[in-house]
Structures are given as C-alpha cells and as structure tokens.
C-alpha cells in the first residue's frame, strides 16, 4: 500500500470501524475519522503530486491543502513553524465542508484557523512567488472567498462569511 493509503486509508480491523449507530451518525462518522488529517496537493502542467504531510519539505509547493481544523491549529501553534503561518496567510479560497458538524466540536479551533489564514506573512522565507500584494498589506481576507457548506443555517456560520475579518477592506 502507498504511504497515502497507510496514513489516510481505512483499517477494517480498527475497533472504531466496528461501531454502529443510527444512519445520521453513520453518515458523519464513516471511514477514517482521524481529526488530525492533512494532505497537500501540487498541481503542475506535467504532473500531480500528493504529500501526506503538506507541512513537510514540499509544503511550499502545495497548491491545494486539505486539512482538518485541528491539524491546521496544531501546525500553526507549534514552535518554530512560522513558515506554516506564512504559507496559510495566502489562502485564496477557504472551503468548509460539513460546517454544521464542526459547530458541535470545538468551534474555537475553527476560529483560530481563520485567524491564522488571515495573518500577514512575516518571514523572509515566505515564497514571494505565491504571496500576492494584498496579503502583504493585511488585506488578504478581502481577497479570499469563503465557501461554507452546512445542513442548516447558524449565526456563527453566517458571521464567518459576513463579518469583516482583521485587515478586511
């Protein structure tokens, strides 16, 4: 099995996979439910690369990041990881799927991720080819599109899309 399958695949022998519940519970908690998940995808004209750990050496080349809020928070708060914050500060599209499920978890983690994504790159090691001028001027959140998918409307989700964030025009 590939490293991607080993890290993110479903282990049928896992006791967590043997649990059963009502249909709505099964719909949310099927497959690999690890809440610290991160994938970096690099898209090039000639090839596509997938990295299980986008914070590793290839992170500066990841065009698409798929990660749980907890994975982003842990990476952003780890000491000596300013490069992670610099990388997250130039996110142009933020897609939050099953946001209603995230509301029932630790919503503060989601808010911290949004603040990390709204930050200004501060490191001289930031990839200047990827950082656009509005992001350097603390107006990156005005250039970012938020897509929030939820099964119901909630004030916290509306605030995520409607309210001005730090540095927003």
Give the positions of each predicted feature.
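Conserved motor-coupling elements within RecA-like helicase/translocase cores
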Residues: 28-34, 45-65
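Loop/turn-to-beta-strand initiation segments
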Residues: 36-38, 61-65, 90-93, 142-147
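Conserved helicase motor
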Residues: 39-49, 69-71
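Interdomain hinge/linker at the junction between the two RecA-like core domains of SF2 helicases
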Residues: 139-145, 154-169
């Amino acid at each position: 099995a590939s490293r991607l399958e080993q890290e993110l695949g479903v282990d049928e022998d896992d006791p967590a996979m043997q649990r059963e519940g009502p249909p709505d519970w099964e719909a949310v908690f099927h497959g690999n439910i690890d809440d610290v998940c991160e994938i970096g995808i690099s898209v090039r004209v000639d090839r596509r690369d997938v990295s299980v750990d986008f914070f590793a050496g290839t992170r500066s080349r990841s065009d698409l990041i798929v990660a749980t809020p907890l994975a982003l928070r842990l990476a952003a708060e780890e000491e000596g990881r300013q490069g992670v914050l610099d990388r997250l500060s130039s996110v142009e599209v933020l897609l939050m799927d099953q946001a209603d499920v995230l509301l029932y978890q630790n919503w503060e983690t989601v808010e911290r991720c949004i603040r990390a994504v709204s930050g200004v790159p501060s490191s001289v090691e930031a990839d200047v080819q990827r950082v656009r001028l509005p992001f350097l001027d603390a107006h990156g959140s005005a250039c970012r599109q938020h897509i929030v998918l939820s099964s119901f409307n909630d004030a916290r989700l509306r605030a995520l899309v409607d309210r001005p964030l730090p540095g927003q025009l």
